[in-house]
Amino acid sequence: MNLNDILKELKLSLIANKNIDESVYNDYIKTINIYKKDLSNYVVVVKSQFGLLAIKQFRPTIENEIKKILKQPVNISFTYEQEYQKQLEKTESINKDHSDIISKKNKKVNENTFENFVIGSSNEQAFIAVQTVSKNPGISYNPLFIYGESGMGKTHLLKAAKNYIESNFSDLKVSYMSGDEFARKAVDILQKTHKEIEQFKNEVCQNDVLIIDDVQFLSYKEKTNEIFFTIFNNFIENDKQLFFSSDKSPELLNGFDNRLITRFNMGLSIAIQKLDNKTATAIIKKEIKNQNIKTEVTNEAINFISNYYSDDVRKIKGSVSRLNFWSQQNPEEKVITIEIISDLFRDIPTSKLGILNVKKIKEVVSEKYGISVNAIDGKARSKSIVTARHIAMYLTKEILNHTLAQIGEEFGGRDHTTVINAERKIEMMLKKDKQLKKTVDILKNKILTK
């Protein structure tokens, strides 16, 4: 039994417990999570420290229910989210230190290479441009200006350029820095003597290649821009390569002297577009391989992640790290399904998937059963309509995590006991009816990825 199933059964039993007031359930218990430390140790995580105190008297009840569900003796601890996150970060830090030691021993290759960059329609032109210039620095497209929103892979490409040039042109000296780093150095040096300012310029100009990531951080800094302008001209005049990245195209940059904007456009300016779904999916699969996740991840689960995170490569990698952690905590699970994924990422606002609401759930379910949305909300008692209504209620609880009272109101003003009965009935049917389970899985996938 996976953690998602355990949590579902636990919440159903607790809401039916007459000793637990509905307001206590809705305020503190509804949002709890359960995680597995190892085969015999589980941890129940409450949203806040206050919530942890509020459910103190119900801890024995929660422990007993979990043991009943698992049908085995286990150790159960309780904590709250902030504290649990601290514990996770501490564990990750220890694991990272261990990984760093192993990496050094194995002389692990830098991950920011052209070979490790996932190419798709959204970034192909930028990739070709950076790779081409890296193979012939200072010859053409000088400067090379890459622009696009944060998290699209600009930093990866610029670091790949640095690594490639250093590996293939041992006689060339390469300097890589962020725009913020350059600005801080310039501001510091401007407090010093003219001689020291000139020395700083000369030190930067000793390089054969200059790469500045997020050059927009130099905007609205007049004195810094004067230093930058001098350095820029030195590189161009001496056929030394310049690489820049920014969140905007040169024409849209504010806070720069016009002569700098003109020079940004002297070479080649090229955009990295938002990731398309195909590229995001490829990045997820590559990251799963890179993180050596042995548990199989279904295509539906991967599509779910790409729908959430196609706007940011860093978030994609972070989401796969979350999968990796879950996989390590649940070694007995052989497959990561969309049900597990949707539960694992339930803390992420559903707005990231577009308009995900009760209306959408009703529409998808009613379409499947060939009935109207009004029929789901109405009083009709035919078998197909009742089944569709119960499934829609069940999915509303599963996906949106609405309260029983909310769901009752959203489905024709029914009371919360009707919702409990509907949810329990579907839960029981899913355990016995494989075809129904398949249907519900398909509906859930369609709702989440449509």
UniProtKB/Swiss-Prot annotation:
In this chain, ATP is annotated as bound at 151, 153-155
Any transmembrane segments, and where? none
The GO annotation for biological process reads: DNA replication initiation; regulation of DNA replication
Q: Please give the Gene Ontology molecular function terms for this protein.
A: ATP binding; ATP hydrolysis activity; DNA replication origin binding; lipid binding
Region ranges (Domain III, AAA+ region):
108-327
Cellular localization per UniProt? Cytoplasm; Cell membrane
Q: What induces its synthesis?
A: Transcription is constitutive; transcription is reduced by treatent with DNA damaging agents methylmethane sulfonate (MMS) and mitomycin C (MC). Protein levels remain constant during treatment with MMS, MC and chloramphenicol (at protein level).
One matching Pfam family is Bac_DnaA_C
PROSITE patterns with a match to the protein in the record = DNAA
Q: Which Gene3D superfamilies match?
A: 1.10.1750.10, 1.10.8.60, P-loop containing nucleotide triphosphate hydrolases
* Start and end residues of each stretch annotated as Domain II: 76-107
Keyword check for ATP-binding: yes
Name the predominant localization.
Answer: cytoplasm
Q: Does the keyword Cytoplasm apply?
A: yes
Instruction: Please list where the region (Domain I, interacts with DnaA modulators) is annotated.
Output: 1-76
UniProt xrefs under CDD domains: AAA, Bac_DnaA_C
Q: Give the UniProt keywords, A-Z.
A: ATP-binding, Cell membrane, Cytoplasm, DNA replication, DNA-binding, Lipid-binding, Membrane, Nucleotide-binding
Oligomer status and interactors:
Oligomerizes as a right-handed, spiral filament on DNA at oriC.
Tell me its family: Belongs to the DnaA family.
What does the entry's domain section say? Domain I is involved in oligomerization and binding regulators, domain II is flexibile and of varying length in different bacteria, domain III forms the AAA+ region, while domain IV binds dsDNA.
Q: Share any extra remarks.
A: Estimated to be present at 2000-3000 molecules per cell.
Q: What is this protein called?
A: Chromosomal replication initiator protein DnaA
Gene from which this protein is expressed: dnaA
